[in-house]
From Swiss-Prot:
Needed co-factor(s): Mg(2+)
Role according to the record: This enzyme is involved in nucleotide metabolism: it produces dUMP, the immediate precursor of thymidine nucleotides and it decreases the intracellular concentration of dUTP so that uracil cannot be incorporated into DNA.
Gene3D superfamilies to which the protein is assigned, alphabetical: 2.70.40.10
Protein name in UniProt: Deoxyuridine 5'-triphosphate nucleotidohydrolase
EC number per UniProt: 3.6.1.23
NCBIfam families documented for this protein: dut (TIGR00576), PRK00601.1 (NF001862)
GO BP, one annotated term: dUMP biosynthetic process
Gene: dut
Binding annotation for substrate: 60-62, 73, 77-79
GO molecular function: dUTP diphosphatase activity; magnesium ion binding
Organism: Tropheryma whipplei (strain Twist) (Whipple's bacillus)
InterPro entries found in the cross-reference section: dUTPase, dUTPase-like, dUTPase-like_sf, dUTPase_trimeric
Disulfide bond is among the record's keywords: no
Alphabetical UniProt keywords: Hydrolase, Magnesium, Metal-binding, Nucleotide metabolism
Pathway given in the UniProt record: Pyrimidine metabolism; dUMP biosynthesis; dUMP from dCTP (dUTP route): step 2/2
Amino acid sequence: MTVEVLFKGGYTPQRAFDGDAGFDLQSSHTAVIQPRCRQVVKTGIAIALPDGYAGFIMPRSGLASENGITLVNSPGVIDAGYRGEISVVLINTDLHQAFHISQGDRIAQLVIMPVCHASFIEVDTLPGSARGISAFGSSGRHDTRG
């Protein structure tokens, strides 16, 4: 996959470990996210995804659990035809502590997956299923297997 680094000294996405699904995205600049505020953080890169694939920007679990930092739109979707700079919309859920980002900090992860380009066919009635129209909470909270 090709990547364009948009500033000198930029950061090509990398996986921390061989088996990782996500490639770390790093901040191209410093930033401060105030408590209960959101901010667009640029990565300084653009990528060319192959047709039939999309990139999904996901939160980093350590930032979420240790600092309350997550994504406003999770996941953020990068379509195969998009060639602009990848930006990440972060939110600081902490009520009191500002979050400081340094240039090069890992701020999110990019997971690349194949996508199905489906077509929709309008029908009068959908076929039945075991679940039917049961919605939120329909499977229960507790394990009932025995």
